[in-house]
């Protein structure tokens, strides 16, 4: 029998499991180590494409017709996913959906084949690469269209939010106000290779004014203090949501003008709501909106500027608040408003609450106190910081960080999908879901993508000089691919409300994107947040702003240096 060393095997086919012990992969330049939990491939029967390799007619490629074969296979990939786990497998894609996770090849010549390769099958070499589900960003201010290219370049494939461009209202709030703007923005977003969903303006105590936006195609409603986050508007908005099965997102009342945090909680009446930037620097009852992370009906999220807590976090936030919310630094009241939102103690506690699974979702707040291209990056920087400061999580060891890795990847994949009723199509690497997949070189994990697939078609990839003789010469840049053009844009989805699908005005928009209704939004609770469902009793000292969870003081230091930072962006 011919033998191969473990290191040589990993170089050729990627990491594996031998004798119950998995190979380990470092994520970028962090302290995080992922250990392979299972390998679906079979030693000696691996498939690989290339000259002299296995995927050839009569060998790893069968003679079967397209109906029996996958359209695309990703070979020997390391999947990192909150639901599927950290596993090595071949991934089959058929009709834009993930059709198999297992062993690819030719069943006429190989044992154990669950994914059939034929003449109609394209191959993406996954050896040595990590595959994740595309990120879902639920806090997008649709200010400029160039955000989308930036988002794709960092692995985001679903963008949910609101706005109409650089209008003053959109610079501050994530809502697309009214049926006319809703139609115009759905048509504009039809030109881009990402899944999209729009929030209508939820800040109204008029039932009809909210319902007409949902009928016009809003997948959810956003309550924002700049438009009014009063108990009356909260109650009315949640009433409409309960009727139409959509999600409500909230940016609550920083100034406590219409009531304190207890009044806002009372207005919820136990109904499900998605709390944006729940720490509070991005907005919300000062100083104690962070208490919402301990409520079973609240789905708590962070926006990325406060994540993780570093020596620069406090300083940059004051200017961000002033610009974003149209404040005047010469007006004392405006300055006091901004300063009330920025608290070292609650920002530090936010890191720990993420690490313990009390905060469930990460998002960007793009161009409105957040960076659209850093949702993935800052999630992993936070995980690194917490390992450095707090050590291994329960279930982890000095050898690997699988539990922490699965907890953190859930924050921008499956949990936002569950929160907004789209988990039946996106959010995890599972059979039956859209093949919205991101391939990463481990050294660049979370920083710069290798390739982004939308429904199995490449829409963005790291490619060299297009005038060169091969695809690798410098400058290697992340560029739009064929899936970004023409009618291939149909590989993406526009998420809307169920009630809007029966509205002729929506069907007459003539969108390339497939319209899909959100579902099950109102039955979701914190318990449904995968690997992030801890419900501590959270309190905030009103004088010192110190945060306690189940009576324990949450405190951590700001970092002076982070991984996934300057060394990756010198060019």
Swiss-Prot record:
EC number: 3.5.1.5
Gene Ontology cellular component terms for the protein in this record: cytoplasm
Free-text description of this protein's post-translational modifications in UniProt: Carboxylation allows a single lysine to coordinate two nickel ions.
Reaction(s) this enzyme catalyzes, per UniProt: urea + 2 H2O + H(+) = hydrogencarbonate + 2 NH4(+)
Domain of life from the UniProt record: Bacteria
Binding site residues for substrate: 224
Binding-site residues, Ni(2+) 1: 139, 141, 222, 365
Main localization category: cytoplasm
Pathways per UniProt: Nitrogen metabolism; urea degradation; CO(2) and NH(3) from urea (urease route): step 1/1
PANTHER family per UniProt: UREASE
Family from the record: Belongs to the metallo-dependent hydrolases superfamily. Urease alpha subunit family.
Protein's name in the database: Urease subunit alpha
Species, as recorded: Bordetella pertussis (strain Tohama I / ATCC BAA-589 / NCTC 13251)
Gene: ureC
């Amino acid at each position: 029998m011919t033998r191969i060393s473990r290191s040589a095997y990993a170089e050729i086919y990627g990491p594996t499991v031998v004798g119950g012990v998995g190979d380990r992969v470092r994520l970028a330049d962090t302290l995080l180590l992922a250990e392979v939990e299972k390998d679906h491939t079979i030693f000696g029967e691996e498939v690989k494409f290339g000259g002299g390799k296995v995927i050839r007619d009569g060998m790893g490629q069968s003679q079967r017709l397209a109906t029996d074969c996958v359209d695309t296979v990703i070979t020997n990939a390391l999947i990192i996913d909150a639901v599927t786990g950290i596993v090595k497998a071949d991934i089959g894609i058929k009709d834009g959906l993930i059709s198999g996770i297992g062993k690819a090849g030719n069943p006429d010549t190989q044992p154990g084949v669950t994914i059939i390769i034929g003449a109609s099958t394209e191959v993406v070499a996954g050896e040595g690469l990590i595959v994740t589900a595309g990120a879902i960003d639920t806090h997008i201010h649709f200010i400029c269209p160039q955000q989308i290219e930036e988002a794709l370049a960092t692995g985001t494939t679903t963008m949910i939010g609101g706005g109409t461009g650089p209008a003053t209202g959109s610079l501050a709030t994530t809502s697309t106000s009214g049926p006319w703007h809703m139609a115009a923005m759905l048509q504009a977003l039809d030109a881009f290779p990402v899944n999209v969903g729009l929030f209508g303006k939820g800040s109204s105590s008029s039932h009809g004014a909210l319902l007409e936006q949902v009928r016009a195609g809003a997948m959810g409603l956003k309550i924002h203090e700049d438009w009014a986050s009063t108990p009356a508007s909260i109650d009315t908005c949640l009433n409409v949501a309960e009727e139409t099965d959509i999600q409500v997102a909230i940016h609550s009342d920083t100034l406590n003008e219409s009531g304190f945090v207890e009044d806002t909680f009372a207005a919820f009446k136990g109904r499900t709501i998605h709390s944006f930037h729940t720490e509070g620097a991005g907005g919300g009852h000062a100083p104690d909106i962070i208490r919402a992370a301990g409520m079973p009906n609240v789905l708590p999220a962070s926006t990325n500027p406060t994540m993780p807590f570093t020596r620069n976090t406090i300083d940059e936030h004051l200017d961000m608040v002033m610009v974003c919310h149209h404040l005047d630094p010469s007006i004392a009241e405006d300055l006091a408003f901004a300063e009330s939102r920025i608290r070292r103690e609650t920002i530090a506690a936010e890191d720990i609450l993420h690490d313990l699974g009390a905060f469930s979702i990460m998002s960007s707040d793009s161009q409105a106190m957040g960076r659209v291209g850093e949702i993935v990056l800052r999630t992993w920087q936070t995980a690194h910081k917490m390992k450095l400061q707090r050590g291994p999580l329960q279930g982890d060891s000095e050898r690997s960080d699988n539990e922490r890795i699965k907890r953190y990847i859930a924050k921008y994949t499956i949990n936002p999908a569950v929160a907004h009723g789209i988990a039946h199509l996106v959010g995890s690497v599972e059979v039956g879901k859209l093949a919205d997949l991101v391939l990463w070189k481990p050294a660049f994990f979370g920083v710069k993508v290798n390739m982004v697939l939308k429904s199995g078609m490449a829409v963005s990839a790291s490619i060299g000089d297009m005038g060169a003789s091969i695809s690798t010469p410098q400058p290697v840049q992340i560029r739009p691919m064929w899936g970004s053009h023409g009618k291939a844009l149909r590989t993406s989805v526009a998420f809307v409300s169920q009630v809007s699908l029966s509205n002729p005005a929506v069907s007459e928009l003539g969108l390339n994107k497939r319209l899909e209704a959100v579902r099950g939004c109102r039955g979701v609770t914190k318990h449904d947040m995968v690997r992030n469902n801890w419900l501590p009793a959270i309190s905030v000292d009103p004088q010192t702003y110190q945060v306690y969870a189940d009576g324990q003081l949450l405190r951590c230091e700001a970092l002076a240096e982070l991984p996934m930072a300057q060394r990756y962006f010198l060019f």
